[in-house]
Amino acid sequence: MSPQIRVNKMGWRISTHSERSTNTDLMEGPTPRHSLLSGRYKQSFAYLTLRSRMPGIMQQVIMRVVNDLPMLEEKFGEEVRKDVKQIVDAIERLKMELNRDRQFLQFHGNEPDKAEWNAFLSELPRPKRTFFRACWLHAECYLYRRIFSFFENSRFLHNFDCFDHLKQEDLIISEETMKILAKATRDLPKTFDNFHKLLRINLWCNHFEIQLGAFTFTEEEPQNDINVLAKVADIDRVLLVNDSVLVWNCLMKPGPNGIVDYICDNGGFEFFADMVLLEYMVDNNLATQVRLHVKAIPWYISDLTRPDVEWTINYLVHHEDECLSALGKKWARLISSEKIVIAPVSHFWTGPQPYFVMVESDIELYRVLTNSRLAIFKGDLNYRKLMGDYIWDSAEEFITCLRGFRPTNICAMRTVKCEVVCGLPEGMADTLLRNDHTWMISGSYGVIQYTDSLKCSCAFPGEENNIKSEHWPALVQPRSGRSTGAQTPIG
């Protein structure tokens, strides 16, 4: 099908339909087990993302800069029109390259990480250097990196975040939910039960605002009750692996090092929920300091950057609601006193590499993580990088799938949104598939997984996977899992 072209108000020709690939060697069916996720397989979520979702995202970026042109002209003058036209043209070319499954191109501009990217691209086998034949992680990261490079190499818009309005709107529309969560979490006692509830709210926070809006409170269920909010967070959600006890016990162990590294995912309301959890940890001496690891550039639409952190705190500090304003001021104090800090920016987080190569490709970042008690990796993309975007057997141990990446104790919190998952009881994935064929991409299932940095990669029979039994009648009864360590909370 030929692309549909329209002429916008600036006289520029903009495609409104993606060109179809002329490739004939893409394969029917899902990505096979024991292989990297790839858009080569037409029944994979990777193929759907590359064929439909990414061209749509690029079109949205085009419309953002075109619609912002009057504001940009007011700020920079008429010369910014040239920047905008060049960016639009470059994104249109990138869409064409994607849909025709072209080879990845080297970076030749002002990108501070171009040497690392170009080395990585040069080392890829030639058959794995095109969008649909490459590992999905490589193709997707390359697309987002190329998109920002167009801004980065412009004269006026080198710091322009084409996604910031989406992150800010997500926080603004969640105002009522933020008020409820803020009031319910003031002065919570230091107990495992409260910590566990905050973890679950944090895990499901992308659904939480909608669920809370639809929930009918009884007289016995006040909105500012953390128990009720945790129940709301769990509505229609299933926690497949729950190592919360192990995470708590890790944080409760005595020792001089109480630093927690938090590898962030999204901005907006999710970052608000992150801060509620991290504030609780600092207030109750579960962490002496929390280091936030944010993205160096605009990334995956909603990922958190340093300007997003600053904007969020400033928005809360100046909010008209007294509770939210007080909360913003408290978080600002935690940051100024370095109880919560933004870690030095690393482009490794916006690179295409899985985390098990960090020790070779960014030894300084790896050393930073070794100096903490716990590293918490939040979200689906971080999980994919921990797993190497590889389809493991679903019952394979979490620690095995990390492939030697053990700078410190590790926790992964993630809602399942793609075919990469591990650490499930034997047979659970098959039963889930029979009952819900979308379970791997729906976001309705989640995991909180933990491994100790010194744990060996062997099975420990007879230990129970800590899964809530009431979730299981329609699925499968839980059997022995692979979590290790005491299943009783310390303290």
What residues fall within each predicted segment?
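C-terminal functional extensions of proteins
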Residues: P3-S38, V294-A296, D303-G491
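Conserved structured core elements
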Residues: L48, L137, V241, F271-M275, ...
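Histidine-anchored nucleotide/phosphate-binding helix
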Residues: F269-R291
